[in-house]
UniProtKB/Swiss-Prot annotation:
Coarse class of the protein's main subcellular location: cytoplasm
GO annotation, cellular component aspect: cytosol
Disulfide bonds, paired cysteine numbers: C205-C211
Protein name: Peroxiredoxin
Recorded GO MF terms: peroxidase activity; thioredoxin-dependent peroxiredoxin activity
Domain of life the protein comes from: Archaea
Enzyme class, first EC level, given as a word: oxidoreductase
Note: The active site is a conserved redox-active cysteine residue, the peroxidatic cysteine (C(P)), which makes the nucleophilic attack on the peroxide substrate. The peroxide oxidizes the C(P)-SH to cysteine sulfenic acid (C(P)-SOH), which then reacts with another cysteine residue, the resolving cysteine (C(R)), to form a disulfide bridge. The disulfide is subsequently reduced by an appropriate electron donor to complete the catalytic cycle.
Binding sites annotated in the UniProt record for substrate: R121
Catalytic residues (positions): C46 (cysteine sulfenic acid (-soh) intermediate)
Family under the similarity heading: Belongs to the peroxiredoxin family. Prx6 subfamily.
Domain Thioredoxin: 2-158
Keywords: Antioxidant, Cytoplasm, Disulfide bond, Oxidoreductase, Peroxidase, Redox-active center
Organism: Thermococcus kodakarensis (strain ATCC BAA-918 / JCM 12380 / KOD1)
Length: 216
């Protein structure tokens, strides 16, 4: 099983868009990817998730992020299910879906719960260097919230770019709104620097260990 901060395992996979190599396929394009597993094709909760993901796919792509699905179904099942979604729900699925019919990648990533033969609803966010940045699991009986996954991706990218941390429900936090948290001071000198920055109006603080600022 892999964990956050590790390199995504190099693997060749069969998808609805042909055979691709992960994570290189996206890394070579300078893109992040969101790999998400679903328990099975032609099931109600999974259908709502695919419909909702396609509705938001442009928002992911605007961030330089590509979605890619996965289940232990065969590729022809994926294709037929995607046809059904287009014909009955009016959404053409434009992202690839992995046919992991032997469950090898799902097993390697820890997507299959103990005693089960199908995947849970796992989400792996992988950056453009092939590093796993976040992992989220939902049980089969509860569908995911893609808006929260979008928020998570945005927060990771802002954190990388600005060197800050992001609070609960950012950018709609109850305490500091859309502001970002400055990394806590770890030395006496850094405490003084925080106090000086606060005096200059560069940051705001509840205390020296809890400072925040407006993102520019």
């Amino acid at each position: 099983m892999v964990v956050i901060g590790e390199k995504f395992p190099e693997v060749e996979v069969k998808t609805t868009h042909g055979v691709i190599k992960l994570p290189d396929y996206f890394a070579e394009q300078g893109k992040w990817f969101v790999l998400f597993s679903h328990p099975a094709d032609f099931t109600p909760v999974c259908t709502t998730e695919f419909y909702a993901m396609q509705k938001r796919v442009d928002q992911f792509r605007e961030l330089g992020v590509e979605p890619i699905g996965l289940s232990v179904d065969q590729v022809f099942s994926h294709i037929k299910w995607m046809e059904w979604i287009k014909e009955n729900l009016g959404e053409e699925i434009t992202f690839p879906v992995i046919a992991d019919d032997r469950g090898e990648l799902a097993d390697k990533l820890g997507m299959i719960p103990s005693g089960a033969t199908i995947t849970a609803r796992a989400v792996f966010i992988v950056d453009d260097k092939g590093i796993i940045r976040a992992i989220v699991y939902y049980p089969a009986e509860v569908g995911r919230d893609w808006d929260e996954i979008l928020r998570l991706v945005k927060a990771l990218k802002v954190s990388d770019e600005k060197g800050v941390a992001l609070p609960h429900k950012w950018p709609n936090n109850e305490l500091i709104g859309d502001k970002a948290i400055v990394p806590p001071a770890s030395t006496v000198d850094e405490v003084k620097q925080r106090e000086e920055a606060k005096a200059k109006g560069e940051i705001e603080c509840y205390d020296w260990w809890f400072c925040y600022k407006k993102l520019e």
